[in-house]
A protein has these predicted regions:
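Membrane-interface interhelical connector segments
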Residues: 50-66
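Extended, low-polarity transmembrane helix blocks
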Residues: 1-50, 68-76, 80-83, 87-151
Length: 151
């Protein structure tokens, strides 16, 4: 790549001298976001694994039957999906599964609880983030990238 080509590509930045910094930090920011989302899912999934009967009661209490099936799926998706996101392993399927869980929570808050956007706001934000990883993959710093395979 010539200097002229590099400079014309940097013209999109208000301060072109920052382009190398952006290029270096963008993959780190993407990794940080993926890890934070993964940790959040692990934190939400762990109590459901520790107290499966409580998880069954919770999902049945909001209308999902059979409770044992939905509680198991929810706990596994949150906990193990979170671990996969943290590692950046099987990122697309893990992110797709967590996106589905979040879309169910959006529906629940919006329709079932009649809270509209106010109740579903955080789920919409998190679903947007997990959808990003479902479509784009884990990024540079991930096990997926290390092994050279992505689904």
């Amino acid at each position: 790549m010539t200097n002229a080509t590099q400079n014309s590509g940097d013209a999109r930045y208000l301060i072109p001298a920052l382009a190398p910094i952006y290029a270096r930090l963008a993959p780190l920011a993407e990794t940080l976001l993926r890890v934070v989302v993964g940790v959040a899912f692990v934190i939400h999934g762990w109590p459901k694994i520790q107290n499966p009967l409580g998880a069954v009661e919770m999902v049945q209490g909001i209308g999902f039957y059979p409770g044992w099936l939905w509680a198991t799926a929810l706990a596994a998706t949150e906990f193990f999906g979170g671990l996969l996101l943290i590692a950046g392993l099987l990122t697309r399927p893990a992110a797709l599964a967590t996106t589905f869980v979040l879309l169910v929570t959006v529906w629940f808050h919006w329709v079932q609880m009649d809270q509209g956007y106010k109740g579903a706001e955080l789920s919409i934000i998190w679903a947007s983030v997990t959808l990003f990883f479902a479509l784009n993959g884990a990024g540079r710093y991930s096990v997926d990238r290390l092994i050279g395979r992505q689904i």
